[in-house]
């Protein structure tokens, strides 16, 4: 299985990079993991609704350019479906069973994802109603993907 995580913005925090790298290394025995970062759109602190839409659209275009047409897309969105770790594992296993060998998780920038990205997504998943920094979300996501594979294989880790 090929799993791609497309996220907006460059990861700068060393402690997050170390955590992500550790889980990517652990995942190596289960799946091929690609981390793709697209540039975030520079914007002032105070934006009108129209300006926010423009920023999200530009970031969305960059995201969509990185996703092939044969990829199953899971957009991380606050209004998406919340799952337990077991449900996430079962869903990933089901995708593999039905021949979906390319899966992309998409993490938006600080303003979220543009409607075009949400429309392209095959599903939307939420990790809760709290707002998290998108770079921290990447670490949480990689850990949950690793946990999913451990659950699928019946290996100890998940408690």
Swiss-Prot record:
List where in the cell it is found.
Cytoplasm
EC number(s) per entry: 2.1.1.177
- Amino acids binding S-adenosyl-L-methionine: 76, 108, 127-132
Record keywords: Cytoplasm, Methyltransferase, rRNA processing, S-adenosyl-L-methionine, Transferase
An example of a GO molecular function for this protein is: rRNA (pseudouridine-N3-)-methyltransferase activity
One GO location term (cellular component): cytoplasm
Q: Which CDD domains match?
A: RlmH-like
Taxonomy, superkingdom? Bacteria
Q: Which reaction does it catalyse?
A: pseudouridine(1915) in 23S rRNA + S-adenosyl-L-methionine = N(3)-methylpseudouridine(1915) in 23S rRNA + S-adenosyl-L-homocysteine + H(+)
Assembly, in brief, is:
Homodimer.
Task: Please explain the role this protein plays, according to its UniProt record.
Answer: Specifically methylates the pseudouridine at position 1915 (m3Psi1915) in 23S rRNA.
Indicate the family of this protein. Belongs to the RNA methyltransferase RlmH family.
Q: What is this protein called?
A: Ribosomal RNA large subunit methyltransferase H
Name of the encoding gene? rlmH
């Amino acid at each position: 299985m090929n799993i791609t995580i497309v996220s907006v913005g460059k990861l700068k925090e060393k402690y997050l990079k170390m955590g992500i790298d550790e889980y990517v290394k652990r995942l190596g025995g289960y799946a091929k993991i690609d981390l793709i970062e697209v540039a975030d759109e520079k914007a002032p602190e105070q934006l009108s609704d129209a300006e926010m839409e423009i920023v999200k659209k530009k970031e969305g275009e960059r995201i969509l350019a990185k996703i092939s047409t044969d990829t199953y897309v899971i957009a991380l969105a606050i209004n998406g479906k919340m799952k337990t770790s077991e449900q996430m594992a079962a869903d990933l296993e089901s995708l593999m069973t039905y021949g979906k060998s390319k899966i992309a998780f998409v993490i938006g920038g600080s303003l979220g994802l543009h409607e075009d990205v949400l429309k392209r997504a095959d599903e939307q998943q939420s990790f809760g109603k709290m707002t998290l920094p998108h770079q921290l979300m990447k670490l949480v996501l990689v850990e949950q993907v690793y946990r999913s594979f451990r659950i699928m294989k019946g290996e100890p880790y998940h408690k």
